[in-house]
């Protein structure tokens, strides 16, 4: 449009020379301004890439960013992993830890109730228990417990038996007999009335706790032992 104005001005001046002579300064200024406008328009038309370059850079920068759908999917994936880990911990790990800690918890409760056992002794109910660090014969175990002001293990009830078996599956007890023709007695001289397996063997005259039952074995064999001291 500016180009048309400039052309129209030039034609008008050519047709009216008298008018051109009356105002020479104004026409010269108008022509100069028109030429500048035409040059600016032509420059813009010749270099359209300059205007689009900035726009392309903006779109290129935006293309570097992940779309909102991708970000949402990644966040949901992380949340799912965290939830699965929490469920596995609740279902598997916590019951496992509770099961493994059931006996230590029982001992802790008993210690709080009594709390008078020497160091390295286990407290359960109203008694203290010492676990021998080495295997000994029945007679040697009896002497070792006597030196600790205690007696070789005696079992009062089934609950105590289960508790001790969970700590050590095999140990001497303070039950014996003189021969297969004599009854089983405790070290205190009391008749032992509970069943003892394999009591028909003539040489098996000492009783031990094995798993959840009592069985007769040779008194000269080496076994682990418990010392017991009642509070």
Curated annotation (Swiss-Prot):
Its main location: membrane. It is a single-pass type II membrane protein. It comes from Macaca mulatta (Rhesus macaque). Glycans are attached at residues 100, 149. This is NKG2-C type II integral membrane protein. One of its GO terms (molecular function) is carbohydrate binding. The gene is KLRC2. CDD domains: CLECT_NK_receptors_like (cd03593). Immune activating receptor involved in self-nonself discrimination. In complex with KLRD1 on cytotoxic lymphocyte subsets, recognizes non-classical major histocompatibility MHC-E loaded with signal sequence-derived peptides from non-classical MHC-G molecules, likely playing a role in the generation and effector functions of adaptive natural killer (NK) cells and in maternal-fetal tolerance during pregnancy. Regulates the effector functions of terminally differentiated cytotoxic lymphocyte subsets, and in particular may play a role in adaptive NK cell response to viral infection. Residues 1-12 have a biased composition (Polar residues). Heterodimer with KLRD1; disulfide-linked. KLRD1-KLRC2 receptor complex interacts with TYROBP/DAP12 homodimer; this interaction is necessary for the expression on the cell surface. It comes from the Eukaryota. Residues 116-229 form the C-type lectin domain. Pfam families: Lectin_C. Residues 94-231 are extracellular. PANTHER family: C-TYPE LECTIN PROTEINS, NKG2-C TYPE II INTEGRAL MEMBRANE PROTEIN. Coiled coil: none annotated. One of its GO terms (biological process) is adaptive immune response. One of its GO terms (cellular component) is plasma membrane. InterPro entries: C-type_lectin-like (IPR001304), C-type_lectin-like/link_sf (IPR016186), CTDL_fold (IPR016187), NKG2/CD94_NK_receptors (IPR050919), NKR-like_CTLD (IPR033992). Residues 1-70 are cytoplasmic. Disulfide bonds join 117-128, 145-227, 206-219. Residues 16-28 have a biased composition (Basic and acidic residues). Residues 1-31 are annotated as: Disordered. It is found in: Cell membrane.
